[in-house]
From Swiss-Prot:
Belongs to the dicarboxylate/amino acid:cation symporter (DAACS) (TC 2.A.23) family. InterPro entries: C4_dicarb_transport (IPR023954), Na-dicarboxylate_symporter (IPR001991), Na-dicarboxylate_symporter_CS (IPR018107), Na:dicarbo_symporter_sf (IPR036458). GO terms for cellular component: plasma membrane. It comes from Solibacter usitatus (strain Ellin6076). Responsible for the transport of dicarboxylates such as succinate, fumarate, and malate from the periplasm across the membrane. The gene is dctA. Keywords: Cell inner membrane, Cell membrane, Membrane, Symport, Transmembrane, Transmembrane helix, Transport. This is C4-dicarboxylate transport protein.
Length: 428
């Protein structure tokens, strides 16, 4: 019992339960807890950019093999594209079989379209050239100041290559970045001590602001989406994991604390630093983890992909805006591009969805007002699926590139999650 009370897992679970209770008993007070959740997520986002930079630079400069770095990046992108496409198709397939919006006969004119317009205005269809140009930061500091993960990743790759080319003169800089990285991970450990407070505030706000009642009116869509995410995790990712020699069940058990943090905060970014440390502790090489995990937050959002296809077709069904098979394939193609711009932040999936429907024009954007009230509750499943998908991706790509210690992977997964006493060694 003493061991349980000293674990982060236990206290985050307690905090989530207390947040739910407060949101139900005193909704206005629960809604007022929002700053606690927002503050915790901002603390995490504060250290994401330097951790990604240090991890990637140390990984690239330490390998001495630039061809391997390029191969890792190429294989990661190939994996992301294939698995993201599978998740989009799975969402499209199940929403057409279950048809959660059929028979609702919603008149879009009766909905509050103004509530959706704010989201639609935030997103727009980017061309490939615009996307690539936006990956390049205006200045070295600008990428860190804005917290743009892809920009920081690009800087880190270039910096690591340049440092590796310096030869013997690189040692001083390498050692400095190594020590700085240790400080950043120690800072993450400090921030994680307040994770239960952040989870409590975020959950209390969600229940207090949106209410449990909003779940029942669209229960069929919610149930269909959650079941689809579970199917993806245990069937698709489970099959991928089994093929590559590890159990998805043991993997989920190993990262259970990170999953609870994501569940409580509804943001996959909240677990990014710890996920990078955990994947290294499972035997994946630092350079692989440093490339795959951050890139996955833009290119491998499996939960968001499932949500996008299901929500778009649900709105079409509910508003009687029939979509032909060809139009659904068009939707799929557009979402393959649009989903790459969805960051791992709460609400980003809804913004991308609104922008996609605006670009296609077949489904009324105002129909999204139907799911605006439950989007926050669906965000948890999106974020959890995203985190699990990126974790599996890092192990798979590490194995493909020969950068995985399979003995360590098997041993760590068998022994289960690290104890509180083992945490400092893993996080360093």
């Amino acid at each position: 019992m003493t061991k349980l009370r000293s674990s982060l897992y236990f206290w985050v679970l307690v905090a989530i339960a207390l947040g739910v209770i407060l949101g139900i008993v005193a909704p206005s007070t629960g809604a007022a807890m929002k700053p606690l959740g927002d503050g915790f997520i901002k603390l995490i986002k504060m250290v994401i950019a330097p951790i990604i930079f240090c991890t990637v630079v140390l990984g690239i400069a330490g390998t001495g093999d630039l061809k391997k770095v390029g191969r890792t990046g190429g294989l990661a992108l190939l994996y992301f594209e294939v698995v993201s496409t599978v998740s989009l198709i799975l969402g499209l397939l199940i929403v057409n079989i279950v048809r959660p919006g059929a028979g609702m006969n919603i008149d879009v004119r009766t909905l509050d379209a103004a509530a959706v317009s704010a989201y639609a205005g935030k997103g727009k269809m980017q061309s490939t050239s615009e996307f690539l140009i936006n990956v390049i930061p205006n200045t070295f500091v600008d990428a860190f100041a804005r917290g743009e993960i892809l920009q920081v990743l690009l800087l880190a790759v270039l910096f690591g290559i340049a440092l590796q080319r310096l030869g013997a003169h690189r040692n001083e800089v390498f050692q400095f970045i190594e020590k700085f990285s240790e400080i950043m991970f120690e800072l993450v450990r400090m921030i994680m001590k307040v994770a239960p407070i952040g989870a409590f505030g975020a959950m209390a706000f969600t229940i207090g602001a949106y209410g449990i009642g909003s779940l029942f009116s669209l229960a069929k869509l919610m149930a269909t989406f959650y079941l689809t995410c579970l199917c993806f995790i245990f069937l698709v990712l489970g099959a991928i994991a089994r093929y590559h020699g590890f159990s998805i069940w043991r993997f989920l058990r190993y990262i259970r604390e990170e999953l609870l943090i994501v569940l409580g905060t509804s943001s996959s970014e909240a677990a990014l630093p710890r996920m990078m440390a955990k994947m290294e502790s499972l035997g994946a090489g630092r350079s692989t983890v440093g490339l795959v995990i951050p890139a996955g937050y833009s290119f491998n959002l499996d939960g968001t992909s499932i949500y996008l296809t299901m929500a778009a077709v649900f709105v079409a069904q509910a508003t009687n805006s029939a979509m032909t098979l060809g139009e659904q394939f068009t939707l799929l193609a557009v979402l393959l591009l649009m989903s790459k711009g969805a960051a791992g932040v709460t609400g980003s999936g809804f913004i991308v969805l609104a922008a996609t429907l605006s670009a296609i024009g077949k489904v009324p954007v105002g129909g999204l007002a139907l799911i605006l009230g439950i989007d926050r509750f669906m965000s948890e499943a999106r974020a959890l699926t995203n985190v699990i998908g990126n974790g599996v991706a890092s192990i798979v790509v590490a194995k493909w590139t020969g950068d995985l210690d399979e003995t360590m992977l098997t041993t760590r997964l068998k022994s289960g999650p690290p104890t509180p006493a083992e945490e400092p060694a893993i996080m360093s």
